[in-house]
Structure formats: structure tokens, C-alpha cells
């Protein structure tokens, strides 16, 4: 069978092109335009760069390129402080100066609202910057594997792969976690524990989890295993506790299923306690190994205050906090509201939320286990706060909100695309978008958090 003849000048996969980078895509890649009109996505490229790139994959209307060399560097390009930044898949923007990162994130939110939400002039404020663009992460989870020599390695996955890039330290995480990373790696090497092989679903150690209270300094270390016991793990855990003064606990999480989920359903404490405490907006929260808590405490505090300001609750009003987690938004909301009702499908988070309310002496909060669409119709909801996962709200949740007819909705989102989609539905249902405030919780990455406020028309 004879293939279709290639037109003169046609671009082919594997070909090298020199292109100017004009923008950043929502996923963090640089964007260029090929001579045939197709969009080219180039990982690691910065607007203002001119790069020589290999066409590694071509589709009908777009393609993907790999940088071979930077012909001319953008004025926004800087030297990445991390020695493995170009290989590690955790950070996409370490080589972009921070002010330009913030501009790009604001543009990303605005364009999502315009193109996906249909808002002509969306009221998007400048992004609230992180005071420390490095060393801000209060949580890290590292896959554990073996290198080509069979030695244990701990690090992050290389972009678009499951090859582990070994790390001695991570400049994005709180530097107080770096010694724990080094100690865990040495412990795994000396103990000779078996390492999980995801291809054959064999071996014990899968992940290492680290947490720290930014304000309290308390640290927690968790080994994730594939259901197998680790010889000598309890005395090893106690030795870690004795070595590090602020290490309050060492835990073992069991995860026996295949797949990319990091933690399994069972966690037990090997030494010390199974939680750290953190202070946010004047409240004290207990955080366990698998608890969801924003990865930058100082920015999470700003987020909580923005939500409370957007809700603008009075002593006569009830606020429903949908997807409430452990109550990090509920408790600050309770200062002004008559009552706050938190809804959360994860039962352990509901138990923790109730515990956090008790610890802080909050009596006008109650927490319900279940789905928003099932529970909201039976509740008084003068104001609704939603903080869904990246996929956004299910259609049934949006319909439940509209049927509750709250006077105000505050929507917290980590995904501008699903935020735009859901705001479009709420506005069509009778609400007016008052404002969108992006907050940078994820410096050196393309991710951005937003707080959107809507009022009933």
C-alpha cells in the first residue's frame, strides 16, 4: 500500500524547527505557532524565548516539541535553583521569574472565564503572591523505587513518566523536611527493606510522606507499604523520633491496591502520635498523614479570610460549607455566622472536623457525613461555600445549590477550567459574578487557587 505523498515543505515528526514562544498553556508548557498554522506545545519554554525544538508528536491541529537549545532567552527566564528542575515533573516554572508567573496565572484564570465560561469582562483581580516562593510546602509525598544499579531511590517522577528523579533535598518544600528525607533514604538503604515494583505489584515500600506545621514546627513521617511488614520498623521509627526533636510521630500506611493513589485506607502509629498540629487564622487544627490540608499554611490563611469576607455572614445567617474537609474554612466562618453546617463525604475528615471544633471551643458548627446533593436540600442555606476537588462540582451539586436559593455563593477552586464551567451554570441560574481573587498557593507550578464570589441577582 502506497502512503499519501508528503507535500513540499510539510512538517514531519522528528523534524527540527526554530520557533518563538509567545504564550503559556494552561498546563504550563510554552506555546508556539508552526508555519502550517498548528499550535506547538513546548515543555520548559518561556514566552519571549526563541527555541530550537524537535517535533516529537504531531496531531491534526497541534503538536508537541522538545527543546534542543535556547537560541535566544526570554527576559523572564532565570536560572532554576533546583539542580534537577528540568527533569523533575513536580515544578513546571522554576525557570520563570516570579512576577511573570503571577501575571501568567491571572491571565490563565481570565482566559478560562472568557473562553469556557462566556464572561465578556470577568472581574479577575491580580494574583496574591506567596511571601516565600520557595520553601513553602508543608507536605511532600515521594515515590520510592530502585535505580539502574538496584539502589533505593526517593524523589519525584520525571515529567510524563514513572521514572523517579532522585532528590537529596527539595527547594520547594519547607527546608525543615529535608533532613527527614535524607534520614529516611539512609534508613531504607541500611535496613534493606524490599521496594515496591508497580509493574509486578510486588515488594513493600511504595511512598514516603512528610508533613510539617509551618507555625508549630511539628513534623510527621509516614511510610506507605504494600501490605507487607518491614523487619525492625518499630525500633527504626523510635530511633528517628530520638534523633529529631520536632518529629512528633512515625506512621505506617497500608496501600495494597494497584494504581497511582498514594495512601491506602489504614494507618497505624509506630512511634509518637499520628498527627501534627497547625495554627491557621487563630485556630488549631490536627492533621493526620492522609488529611487534606492546603500545602502552604500562610496562603491557606489568606484563602480562609477571603472566603469569610466573601461570605459576609451575619449573626442571623446559616452558612453551608460544602466539601468542608477538616473544617479549615468552617471554623473561621463560624466567627460571624449564626451557624455553620459542614458537608463532607470522607467520614474520617468529618470526625476530624468535629474534633477540631471541640479543640477550639466552637459550638455553632456541626458536620455531616454525606454528599452535597443529598444533604443540602434539607438544610437552611443563607450562604453556600463550595470547595470541590479539581473536577469541580457535579451537575447535581450545582442544581442543589440553585434550588437552595442562597443569597450568596463563595466558590473555591484549584482548576480555572472547571471553575469557569460551574460559574457559567450558576450565573445562568440567577446569580451574578461579583469578583474572582486568585491566590498563589503553588509557586513554581502552573497551578492557581481562586475564590469567586456570586450574589443572587
Swiss-Prot record:
Disulfide bonds: none
Keywords carried by this UniProt record: 4Fe-4S, Iron, Iron-sulfur, Metal-binding, Methyltransferase, S-adenosyl-L-methionine, Transferase
Highest rank taxon of the organism: Bacteria
Residues bound to S-adenosyl-L-methionine: 294, 323, 344, 387
SUPFAM superfamilies on file: Nucleic acid-binding proteins, S-adenosyl-L-methionine-dependent methyltransferases
Domain (TRAM): residue spans on this chain: 10-69
Active site: 414
EC number(s) stated in the UniProt entry for this protein: 2.1.1.-
GO BP, sorted A to Z: rRNA base methylation
GO MF: 4 iron, 4 sulfur cluster binding; metal ion binding; rRNA (uridine-C5-)-methyltransferase activity
UniProt: [4Fe-4S] cluster binding residues: 82, 88, 91, 170
Family: Belongs to the class I-like SAM-binding methyltransferase superfamily. RNA M5U methyltransferase family.
NCBIfam families: rumA
Protein name in UniProt: Uncharacterized RNA methyltransferase gll3134
Organism (species): Gloeobacter violaceus (strain ATCC 29082 / PCC 7421)
Amino acid at each position: 500500500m502506497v502512503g499519501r505523498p508528503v507535500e513540499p515543505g510539510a512538517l514531519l515528526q522528528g523534524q527540527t524547527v526554530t520557533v518563538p514562544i509567545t504564550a503559556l498553556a494552561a498546563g504550563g508548557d510554552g506555546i508556539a505557532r508552526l508555519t502550517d498554522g498548528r499550535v506547538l506545545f513546548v515543555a520548559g519554554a518561556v514566552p519571549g524565548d526563541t527555541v530550537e525544538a524537535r517535533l516529537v508528536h504531531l496531531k491534526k491541529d497541534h503538536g508537541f516539541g522538545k527543546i534542543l537549545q535556547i537560541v535566544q532567552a526570554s527576559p523572564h527566564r532565570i536560572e532554576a535553583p533546583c539542580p534537577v528542575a528540568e527533569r523533575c515533573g513536580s515544578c513546571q516554572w522554576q525557570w520563570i521569574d516570579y512576577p511573570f508567573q503571577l501575571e501568567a496565572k491571572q491571565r490563565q484564570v481570565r482566559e478560562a472565564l472568557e473562553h469556557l465560561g462566556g464572561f465578556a469582562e470577568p472581574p479577575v483581580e491580580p494574583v496574591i503572591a506567596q511571601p516565600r516562593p520557595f520553601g513553602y510546602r508543608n507536605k511532600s509525598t515521594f515515590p520510592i523505587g530502585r535505580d539502574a544499579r538496584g539502589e533505593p531511590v526517593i524523589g519525584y517522577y520525571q515529567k510524563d513518566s514513572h521514572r523517579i528523579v532522585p532528590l537529596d533535598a527539595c527547594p520547594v518544600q519547607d527546608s525543615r523536611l529535608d533532613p527527614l528525607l535524607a534520614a529516611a533514604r539512609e534508613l531504607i538503604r541500611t535496613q534493606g527493606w524490599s521496594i515496591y515494583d508497580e509493574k509486578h505489584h510486588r515488594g513493600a515500600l511504595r511512598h514516603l510522606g512528610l508533613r510539617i506545621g509551618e507555625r508549630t514546627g511539628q513534623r510527621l513521617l509516614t511510610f506507605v507499604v504494600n501490605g507487607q511488614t518491614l523487619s525492625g520498623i518499630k525500633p527504626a521509627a523510635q530511633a528517628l523520633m530520638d534523633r529529631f526533636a520536632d518529629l512528633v510521630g512515625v506512621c505506617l500506611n497500608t496501600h495494597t491496591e494497584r494504581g497511582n493513589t498514594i495512601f491506602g485506607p489504614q494507618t497505624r502509629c509506630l512511634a509518637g502520635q499520628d498527627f501534627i498540629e497547625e495554627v491557621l487564622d487563630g485556630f488549631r487544627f490536627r492533621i493526620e498523614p492522609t488529611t487534606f490540608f492546603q500545602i502552604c499554611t500562610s496562603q491557606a490563611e489568606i484563602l480562609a479570610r477571603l472566603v469569610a469576607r466573601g461570605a459576609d455572614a451575619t449573626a442571623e445567617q446559616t452558612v453551608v460549607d460544602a466539601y468542608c474537609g477538616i473544617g479549615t474554612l468552617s471554623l473561621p466562618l463560624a466567627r460571624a455566622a449564626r451557624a455553620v453546617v459542614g458537608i463532607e463525604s470522607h467520614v474520617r475528615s468529618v470526625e476530624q472536623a468535629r474534633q477540631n471544633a471541640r479543640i477550639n471551643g466552637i459550638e455553632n458548627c456541626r458536620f455531616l457525613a454525606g454528599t452535597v446533593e443529598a444533604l443540602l436540600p434539607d438544610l437552611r442555606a443563607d450562604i453556600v461555600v463550595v470547595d470541590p476537588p479539581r473536577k469541580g462540582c457535579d451537575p447535581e451539586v450545582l442544581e442543589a445549590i440553585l434550588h437552595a436559593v442562597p443569597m450568596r455563593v463563595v466558590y473555591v477552586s484549584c482548576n480555572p477550567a472547571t471553575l469557569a464551567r460551574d460559574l457559567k451554570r450558576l450565573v445562568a441560574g440567577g446569580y451574578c459574578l461579583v469578583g474572582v481573587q486568585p491566590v498563589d498557593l503553588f509557586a513554581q507550578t502552573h497551578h492557581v487557587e481562586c475564590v469567586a464570589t456570586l450574589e443572587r441577582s
